[in-house]
Design a protein with these regions (language model features):
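Formylglycine-dependent sulfatase
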Residues: 12-21, 30-447, 451, 460-524
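Compositionally biased, low-complexity intrinsically disordered regions
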Residues: 5, 21-23
Length: 524
């Protein structure tokens, strides 16, 4: 440009127009490059998948390989101490909002007809990225609310195609004892697969039947890829969250794929899920945008092992909906060529909540957490919330040696604080003693008068409480940790004074009904 401007004064007048056109081209190209320089963000999830089911962790121990998921890890960073939540809705809400489930009230598995769901006062990754010119699409399982106002397209996404519940709820209408009257189904039955857009269009494409479950991930991944192709053609940065229905139970694999794992139908579904991940990676390569796309793979929560053999596996104690690590630690890996070191492993503590501030930082807004404390506008809404996530971008890109997160607060689906992890230490305040079968969902968490103490570096699988003859002596010698832990929890709870919980967690028992009756009686 300097050369062009220097020559401008000696140019003949008839070349002024040519120069103007050239400078306009340079300006437009620079503007397009600036938009392109913002990374695309692709989030691909499974459902209820365990660490053992991914061959990157177990080298084929389960009898099959997952080469495409493994590729993300091999070309990026794998986490050993990564946390989801204890169940589906909790894991998804904490990811997309960057807030604790105790703050949003979205800790209980969402059921058809439930009133709880995404609230308009809570920002999302998608909505905040709109400020940076991103196209946003969500495809696959949502599980963040049953009503239209809770759909992703009312919370920052341009397009959504997917289902709203867990798979076993979707197939309930096919049960022989399911009520046949239309009124029951309209009030309590699952909605179909929804296709909606931000302009208010909502289409119910029909029920997610057992037969349709065989191909629903084909349909939603195809739609996601079509969305990506469109944005790539227009040179627009995009954020896509694809969340497959695999491997939530019950697994229904199409006939032509049965046997591809050499194991059982569940394993066939896992291999198929890996192929879906491969579709996305291949498309990024084909479009030539892989180097400018951050790819994150994970799942919502730990395995639902009480449905075995239609279930995932984990080396950690416990399973979904417990206070044990098996319900919380999930496989996680992230790839960003040239930014995140390939083949690296991280022992830092990280949680789903951390991606909101991290993705916003990658888009150029590293102070979104501070802005939201006082009020920040996005998608024509003014949000004022306390983010519980941390910005991991400096750590992921090698600028910082350690990640910013030191703690994990374990909330049950009822919204009770069951445990705290601080660095290597874990204190358990409420214990789920029914560790096996469906009783883990039915039986209550038991409050402890004195918490249990664990060191998750020396005993990551939480075996000492079961096997050690000298555990209590070891505990007593470290009782000095109890009071500081209480103080740490108190500091966290103080944040709720100015940023109180949005809603109370849903309940599967009569507790909420009784609360409503008591509230109504008191208002007379």
């Amino acid at each position: 440009l300097r050369f062009i401007c220097q020559g401008f004064t000696v140019m003949p007048k008839h070349n002024y127009l040519l120069l103007s056109v050239l400078m306009l081209f340079v300006w437009v190209s620079a503007d397009a490059f600036a938009k392109q320089s913002k990374p695309n963000i692709l989030v691909v999830w499974g459902d209820d998948i365990g660490r053992s089911n991914i061959s990157h962790f177990t080298h084929g121990l389960m009898g099959y390989k997952t080469p495409n998921i493994d590729r993300i890890a091999q070309e990026g960073m794998t986490f050993t101490d990564y946390y989801g939540e204890q169940s589906c809705t909790a894991g998804r809400s904490s990811f997309i909002t960057g807030q604790s489930v105790f703050r949003t009230g979205l800790s209980k598995v969402g059921l058809p007809g439930a009133k709880e769901g995404m609230h308009e006062k809570d920002p999302t990754i998608a909505g905040l990225l709109k400020n940076h010119g991103y196209a946003t699409g969500q495809f696959g399982k949502n599980h963040l609310g049953d009503q239209d106002k809770m759909l992703p397209t009312n919370h920052g996404f341009d397009e959504f195609l997917g289902n709203l519940y867990h798979l076993n709820a979707e197939e309930e209408p096919e049960n022989e004892d399911y009520p046949k009257n239309k009124e029951f189904h309209e009030k309590y039955g699952p909605r179909g697969v929804i296709h909606s857009t931000a302009n208010g269009k909502i289409e119910d494409t029909g029920p997610l039947t057992k037969k349709r479950m065989e191909t629903i991930d084909d349909d939603t991944s195809d739609a996601a890829i079509k969305f990506i192709e469109k944005q790539a053609k227009e040179g627009k940065p995009w954020f896509v969250w694809w969340s497959g229905t695999r491997m939530h139970f019950r697994t229904h694999v199409k006939k032509e794929l049965r046997g591809i794992s050499g194991q059982d139908e569940y394993s066939d579904g896992m291999v198929e899920h890996d192929r879906h991940i491969g579709k996305f990676l291949d498309k990024l390569d084909e479009l030539g945008i892989a180097d400018n796309t951050l790819v994150f793979y994970s799942t919502d929560n730990g395995p639902h092992m009480n449905t075995w053999p239609d279930a995932a596996m984990t080396p950690f104690r416990g399973e979904k909906n417990t206070n044990w690590e098996g319900g919380w630690r999930v496989p996680a890996m992230v790839r960003w060529p040239g930014k995140i070191k390939s083949g690296s492993w991280s022992n830092e503590i990280m949680h789903h909540m951390d991606w909101l501030p991290t993705f916003l930082a990658a888009a150029g807004e590293s102070d979104v957490k501070e802005k939201l404390l006082t009020g920040h506008k996005a998608i024509d809404r003014n949000y004022k919330v306390h983010l519980d996530g941390y910005n991991f971008l400096p750590y992921l890109t090698g600028k910082d040696e350690h990640g910013p997160r030191k703690e994990i607060f374990y909330f049950s689906d009822d919204g009770d604080l069951t445990a705290l992890r601080y660095q290597d230490w874990k204190l358990i305040f409420m214990e789920q003693r029914a560790e096996a079968t469906f009783q883990a969902w039915r039986e209550p968490f038991i409050p402890l008068r004195i918490p249990l103490l664990e060191n998750l570096r020396r005993d990551p699988y939480e075996r000492a409480l079961i096997t050690s003859n000298t555990y209590d002596d070891w505990f007593l010698d470290r009782a000095y940790l109890l009071v500081p832990a209480q103080a740490y929890v108190a500091t966290f709870l103080k944040t709720f004074k100015d940023y109180p919980p949005r809603q109370k967690a849903a309940s599967f028992s009569l507790d909420k009904v009784m609360d409503m009756l008591t509230s109504n009686a008191g208002s007379r």
